[in-house]
Amino acid sequence: MTALITFDRVGKRFGNAVVLDDLSFGVRAGERVTLIGPSGSGKTTILRMLMTLTRPDDGTITLAGEPLFHERRGDTLVPAGERHLRAMRRHTTMVFQQYNLFPNMRVLRNVTEAPVHVLGLPPEQAEERARELLGMVGLAGKLDAYPSQLSGGQQQRVAIARALAMRPDVLLLDEVTSALDPELAAEVLDVLRDVARTFDVTMLCVTHAMKFARDVSDRVLMFNEGRIIESAPPGELFDAPTQERTKRFLRSVIDES
């Protein structure tokens, strides 16, 4: 199957720090891929690139058959303008560590705002979809609440519903439970398990929740110093890792949990 996402020899530096080092990998449509590894190994940078928030210094990223940061002019590729980037962003949505809800909008409007103003959906259609999604994440009774009236776990569930309301090809999840206590984190991870079962969406997830990664992933990528050092189905990578660095990382995560 042709890859929906392709990184081809992608490099990224911040000053003298190499964040991504000649990185190449692909993700198939509908695949659930989890990125694990120590902090600073480039995982979040990959998600930010797919949202066009960070540009690579080297290499090419392709999304849905089109170069992400370049556009075609005849037979040549030139740096992408804002119009191209805006069109490419419609393929992806991201749920961040912090919830980033609009504090002055009620829950329902937080979910309908982008579909109406970005996708151009009629308000009635956007609201019907939002009600359905908020029901799915267990918040049907909170439509008129403001974010400040919700727990952290509830706010993150609104953020998940908001992301799905955009009907993305790719759902990006960046440490979505890192700001939550264990009980609230478990609620959010249960919602994401339902998303993985219910929606035909490609998922790239950065997490330190190894049980969740095992449950939902088709493939797990272990990162270290801007490179993938191990790639395998979750049963293989967690039960029989081949790289010593992977073994040390998994031991450290288990010790912290």
Spans of features found by a protein language model:
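C-terminal boundary and immediately downstream tail of ABC-type ATPase nucleotide-binding domains
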Residues: 235-257
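ABC family nucleotide-binding domain
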Residues: 3-234
